[in-house]
Amino acid sequence: MRRPWEPPAFGRALATRAQIANIMKSHLTGQSGSSPGGRRYHTLPAPGFWLLAPFRLQFAQRRTRNLALKSQVFNKMVGSYTLVQETEQEPPRLSPTLSLPTSFGSVAVVDQISSEDRPAFESGFRRYALDHRYYEITQSALGKQFEHLYLLLKDATGTTRAVQPFLLVHQDLVMGTPAFVRRSVEAARRVFPSFLKLPMIMVGCSAGEGDIACDTVSGEIGWTVDGLKEALPQVGRSLGAWMLVFKDYPKSYRSFLDLMVTGGFTRVPSMPATGMELNSRDFEDYLSRKLSHAMRKNLRRKFRKSAEGPPIEFEVVTDITPYAEEVLPLYQGVYQRAAQKFEELNVSYLSELGKKMPDRSRFLIWRIEGRIVAFASCIVHDGVLRDNYIGLDYAVALDRHLYFVTWRDTVIWAMENGCRYYHSAPLNYDPKLHFRMELEPLDLCVRATNPLFNVILRRLLPILEPTRYDPILKKFSNANELW
């Protein structure tokens, strides 16, 4: 039986037992240094650190590879500490990180898609707005924030029928709960710092809603769902995950995710997206038919105010690379103000999105006297404009009502370019309520890998799920659809 501090069987464990012992000593004793007399000393961590130390190590995955220098690199991966000799000539590692037998064949975990498995990966996500290219973009751009991996579901012949992306994360379970809940948890964390911060597998996308891969035989998701139901608990235990989570799946998946309940999963609402049909003749027709008199008056006052001063210029591009460095601080300003945070975009994400998905990516840019003051990152697919991320220059955003200006111009552009539906990412619900948008429920499907903990988790989830603490959500006409 593997001890918690030893490398997993599937790791490339080249470190010696002595090296592992030295690493364990430094990690489990906190900060270390030398006293003025030259004697080594160690600062002991809080007791809670010891309780979860093995799991911290299993998920402390920091890969650093320097191919140009052809040097030895310290590779820390899923609990194993390895010294790896890298060269420019060495091809990418495509061997399974983990392989397990199943009743339908086998399942393998890899961190890159081989040429043999690529057709299954591409066909499995072809019909979705976020296709295989988007998952590769997020893995490349956000790889330092989350460990991006792929689950290969193989049939009895060893042929890969479906490729399902997932993440390894260390997630705070009380994020999104009200202040009194967080204060209670923070009190416990003074003794147990990792209380309700658990290593988990998240099935889905690190920067967007989740989708389930279609299998190559039927072209549907039913076989994949059955395979995930059986394989995920085994994979989770092998990787040291405490929890398994299907992250942010649209309501259309409920009939399939509810099948996971028989496998010990619990479905709860996540923070929903919002949307509205674009069936008006133009924007003025939308204002007149959909919005209340008070809201129309309020918006028109804001638009008149925004028109004062230098004009606001509007442009749409498919590749924002030339402006990525300029717009990123605008996004970061919005990100820092957000009450809930998960992924954080960077220049690489913005640039790769435009270069690799020019057929779907649209970047909307607003300028004042040549300076970019706002931008929006959108995906257009199958008649739907997905308004995913926004950036605002708060030096002028409030005085010029940039949030409302950007929303108006985005909707007008969508109408004029054949979009039938406007989809907006979660949060900031108050203005969307007054825009007469409807909720688009997103679900979490959760299970603990430990059966006893799963019983406790089932009782905690209705308290921890974030939608119950947002009073604005209850005012939407279809709020009852959240569950």
Which residue stretches match the model-derived regions?
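Tryptophan (W) side chains
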Residues: 5-6, 50
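N-terminal, intrinsically disordered, basic low-complexity segments enriched in Arg/Pro/Ser/Thr
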Residues: 7-11, 406
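Short, low-complexity intrinsically disordered segments enriched in A/P/G/S/L with frequent Arg
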Residues: 12-19, 23-26, 32-40, 44-49, ...
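Alpha-helical membrane-targeting segments
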Residues: 52-55, 59-62, 176-203, 449-480
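Active-site/acyl-donor-binding loops of N-acyltransferases
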Residues: 74, 78-104, 168-172, 209, ...
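A conserved beta-strand-loop-helix scaffold within acyl/acetyltransferase catalytic domains
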Residues: 97-184, 242-398, 482-483
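Acyl-donor binding region in acyl/amide transferases
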Residues: 147-148, 154, 161, 167-267, ...
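Hydrophobic alpha-helix feature that most strongly marks membrane-spanning transmembrane helices
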Residues: 332-339, 354-358, 371, 377-378, ...
